[in-house]
Amino acid sequence: MTERGLLIVLSGPSGVGKGTVREAVFKDPETSFDYSISMTTRLPREGEQDGVDYYFRSREVFEQAIKDGKMLEYAEYVGNYYGTPLEYVEEKLAAGIDIFLEIEVQGAMQVRKAMPEGIFIFLTPPDLSELKNRIIGRGTESMEVVEERMETAKKEIEMMASYDYAVVNDVVSKAVQKIKGIVETEHLKTERVIHRYKKMLEGLQ
């Protein structure tokens, strides 16, 4: 029987650097995760590509996927839908492949209910002023939207206790090392490896 893969869920407030950390994790030669690309109805930012950063879809297409039960999770955030297609995630986990989700906090809580065995990591900013500077630095939102995102971020940070781990994103390379350590630790938990030793003992009988 193939050992089921780990589901690693990374989320945190808007502007905390989830995408940057996720990219750094996947560039690290010591990691071997598969990445589940999220679907969204928001417009692409400069440099983003459909099917690489997100699946950019219309609101109608997204809502049909919800009705058809094809979304593992979804949330509406600042007027746009974000979500994770279910089929790809299930296929990879069943094949024993670790899969990495980078999603919004609302969506992470839905995944927590659907797949409580997942590993949930909350990425935090060093402080709120730094978070605000990062959002402003994107240059893609009006100050009204920035303030809206900050209010949402405060509420999301209060939900940190619902996660298994918290990682501060002050230096990206340090955040990546911490995430790698978390995944390595999870793979060593006895409930994941004990079946191997049971088979070994059976072979000695």
From Swiss-Prot:
Keywords: ATP-binding, Cytoplasm, Kinase, Nucleotide-binding, Transferase. Residues 5-184 form the Guanylate kinase-like domain. Essential for recycling GMP and indirectly, cGMP. SMART domains: GuKc. ATP binds at residues 12-19. GO terms for cellular component: cytosol. Pfam families: Guanylate_kin. This is Guanylate kinase. Its EC number is 2.7.4.8. The keyword Nucleotide-binding applies. Belongs to the guanylate kinase family. It comes from the Bacteria. PANTHER family: GUANYLATE KINASE, GUANYLATE KINASE-RELATED. It is an enzyme of class 2 (transferase). It is found in: Cytoplasm. It catalyses: GMP + ATP = GDP + ADP. GO terms for molecular function: ATP binding; guanylate kinase activity. PROSITE patterns: GUANYLATE_KINASE_1, GUANYLATE_KINASE_2.
